[in-house]
């Protein structure tokens, strides 16, 4: 018997544990609370991540190489904070290893995500698409937001999986083809980011982090005019912050600000922004910028 699916279904594809909470935590919490099916697919365990707490430094790839399993636990706690129950790792936990930063020796490991054949990796995701049948997909832009090989590869795999899942002749054993109605890429409007940096600078000596990031340190920054959708997740700001705190090896959260292992402070925002690249935009009523305020706007449910 075919299970009855929720009316609204959102799929997010991310490279590493923590990417989902930083980029889309408020969006995920909002739609999950409203009864939508929210499915997260994470492509690697993030084994090559830099570790913030000194007490956990032994987990690093060049020591115990145990960061990946630890981050599985962090992600589970984050998903609970966001109210999301459907989370999967692409091809199963550990199928693809974190590739490290672009140009690192880890890029050459045969098991790393960067080295995966796109169609092979996309096959795992197409299976998920055929199963959960999302109307909306969220992932990165072609540059992966900031050029990390796993983010670039996640973009390629997500876009290819959307094509494969919609192809009637592809893997009939996976069920009927499914066309995703709307595809969005994550982005951050430059003006909002600069306003957040200004709030950080205004803290003066009381700033929670010793240094402040710049726009060049933040993935996916775009000119405001390019943003096509903004999800107001203000009611879920604490859920997002709690999810980010769960990723303690990677993120330090202090009030409305956070820093990664580079210790550069940046604003923690529950206003999350997107660029629609497939589908029809339906601007919110009264929007003076012509942006959508709902990723499902115009979608038949």
From Swiss-Prot:
EC number of the protein: 3.5.1.103
The record's free-text note on cofactor binding: Binds 1 zinc ion per subunit.
Residues that coordinate or bind Zn(2+): 16, 19, 151
UniProt keyword Cell cycle, yes or no: no
Disulfide bond annotation, renumbered to this chain: none
One MF annotation (Gene Ontology) recorded for this entry: zinc ion binding
Enzyme type, top EC level: hydrolase
Catalysed reaction, written as an equation: 1D-myo-inositol 2-acetamido-2-deoxy-alpha-D-glucopyranoside + H2O = 1D-myo-inositol 2-amino-2-deoxy-alpha-D-glucopyranoside + acetate
Keywords, sorted A to Z: Hydrolase, Metal-binding, Zinc
Any Pfam family the entry gives: PIG-L
Cofactor(s) this protein cannot do without: Zn(2+)
InterPro entries named in the record: GlcNAc_PI_deacetylase-related, LmbE-like_dom_sf, Mycothiol_biosynthesis_MshB
Biological processes annotated in GO: mycothiol biosynthetic process
NCBIfam families with a match to the protein in the record: mycothiol_MshB
Family: Belongs to the MshB deacetylase family.
Function of the molecule: Catalyzes the deacetylation of 1D-myo-inositol 2-acetamido-2-deoxy-alpha-D-glucopyranoside (GlcNAc-Ins) in the mycothiol biosynthesis pathway.
Full protein name: 1D-myo-inositol 2-acetamido-2-deoxy-alpha-D-glucopyranoside deacetylase
Organism: Streptomyces bingchenggensis (strain BCW-1)
Gene name of the record: mshB
